């Protein structure tokens, strides 16, 4: 796979969130949340970073989230459609595979971003996914969405998403591919819609950052494992090799402007965060798992989880 061309518990997040345009801000090496009072940020006190200890052990076997027959346990949320509605059958099962398909879109994506949510949220677990990209991107899909999909983890409850919301507030494990000539981005990058993470002891606010993962040609199957340990650490792995690691996933506590030219008022965002009075309240300890649709077809033949107790 490493060739050169190459989501238990009753936890439920009640926040809404949108993909944010994340801008840089000054930060202290010892803080996971930065304190800053201005018109573009909620007034918070920093949270000190704590030592991250590896969990004591693993409990249980791998359990399938996708049963290979139907979408039992999964619920779609397509932009501009109500929760549970998938009018163009974007997410379907064909030949034992969970397919993200656009054959009813008439070659026009029209920014109808979608997510297929597993109904149970999770906190500490290993997530194993086998997938491949196929076919061609829809003609009006964004340039960055070619050979691009995602695993959204620590995500918001889809029932709290707005009708026009593009992505759930979450941590995105970006699934990528490349063309036969190797043109494309490395696999298993991280993006942070409505969130931030800590890297090297510092709050990291750019929207996406690279991994050392391989480039994977379109049409080729690849298996990846995502190690998620609550709010402690998240690791992206290919063939047992860690290609990206970061800590303390958390909601972005700045008043946002949303990607794609959409605006969200300060009052709306404050209403989302009304139960968040302390910096610790913004730390993400778990949430939903979802599979993304961004305009390029992708197939999954295995989606399974191993919970960590």
Segments from the language model and where they lie:
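Carbohydrate-interacting regions of secretory-pathway proteins
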Residues: 33-309
């Amino acid at each position: 796979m490493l060739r050169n061309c190459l989501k238990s518990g009753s936890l439920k997040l009640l926040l809404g969130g949108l993909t944010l345009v994340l801008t840089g801000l000054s930060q202290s090496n010892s803080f996971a949340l930065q304190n800053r009072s201005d018109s573009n940020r909620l007034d918070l006190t920093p949270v000190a970073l704590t030592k991250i200890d590896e969990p004591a052990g693993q409990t249980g076997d791998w359990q399938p989230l996708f049963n290979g027959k139907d979408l039992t346990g999964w619920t779609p949320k397509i932009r501009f459609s109500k929760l549970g509605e998938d009018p163009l059958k974007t997410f379907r099962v064909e030949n034992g595979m969970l397919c993200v398909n656009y054959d009813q879109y008439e070659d026009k994506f029209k920014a109808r971003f979608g997510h297929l949510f597993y109904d149970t949220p999770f906190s500490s677990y290993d997530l194993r996914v086998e997938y491949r990209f196929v076919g061609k991107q829809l003609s009006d899909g964004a340039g960055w969405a070619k050979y691009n999909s995602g695993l959204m983890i620590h995500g918001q409850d889809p029932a709290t998403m707005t009708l026009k919301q593009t992505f759930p507030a979450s941590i995105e494990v970006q699934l990528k591919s490349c063309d036969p000539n190797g043109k494309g981005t490395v696999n298993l990058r991280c993006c942070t819609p409505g969130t931030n993470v800590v890297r090297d002891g510092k709050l990291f606010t750019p929207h996406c950052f690279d991994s050392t993962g391989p480039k994977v040609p379109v049409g080729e199957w690849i298996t990846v494992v995502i190690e998620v340990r609550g709010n402690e650490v998240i690791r992206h792995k290919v063939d047992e090799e860690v290609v990206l690691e970061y800590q303390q996933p958390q909601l972005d506590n700045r008043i946002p402007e949303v990607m794609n030219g959409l605006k969200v008022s300060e009052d709306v965002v404050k209403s989302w965060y009304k139960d968040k009075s302390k910096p610790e309240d913004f730390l993400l300890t778990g949430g939903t798992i979802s599979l993304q649709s961004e305009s390029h077809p992708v197939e999954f033949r295995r989606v399974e989880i191993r919970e960590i107790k």
